[in-house]
């Protein structure tokens, strides 16, 4: 068996980690051991927050819809119930955009939801 020296692979691995740690403060960007910990933690945060981002945006859309619906004298939950009964299938992202950009069109949607509630 030939002797295997690992200098090239470890150098490449270190280089990859230090490249990811570029811009970090202090030794976190220059010392491999510390950089590895920082990079691993950053990747964990990134993974977690890609999922949290979906929750956060949904909550934002609901808040915007709720604020717009209350101007028309209705609550968010009754509005969503009215949309369901009226057979209007618009997702919260689009509803929030309509409420934010085109209040007249949103008012028409609210009227249809109110009519479906009875």
From Swiss-Prot:
The keyword Ribosomal protein applies. Keywords: Ribonucleoprotein, Ribosomal protein, RNA-binding, rRNA-binding. One of its GO terms (biological process) is ribosomal large subunit assembly. PROSITE patterns: RIBOSOMAL_L20. GO terms for molecular function: rRNA binding; structural constituent of ribosome. One of its GO terms (cellular component) is ribosome. The keyword Signal does not apply. It holds the Pfam family Ribosomal_L20. It comes from the Bacteria. Belongs to the bacterial ribosomal protein bL20 family. Binds directly to 23S ribosomal RNA and is necessary for the in vitro assembly process of the 50S ribosomal subunit. It is not involved in the protein synthesizing functions of that subunit. This is Large ribosomal subunit protein bL20. It comes from Gluconobacter oxydans (strain 621H).
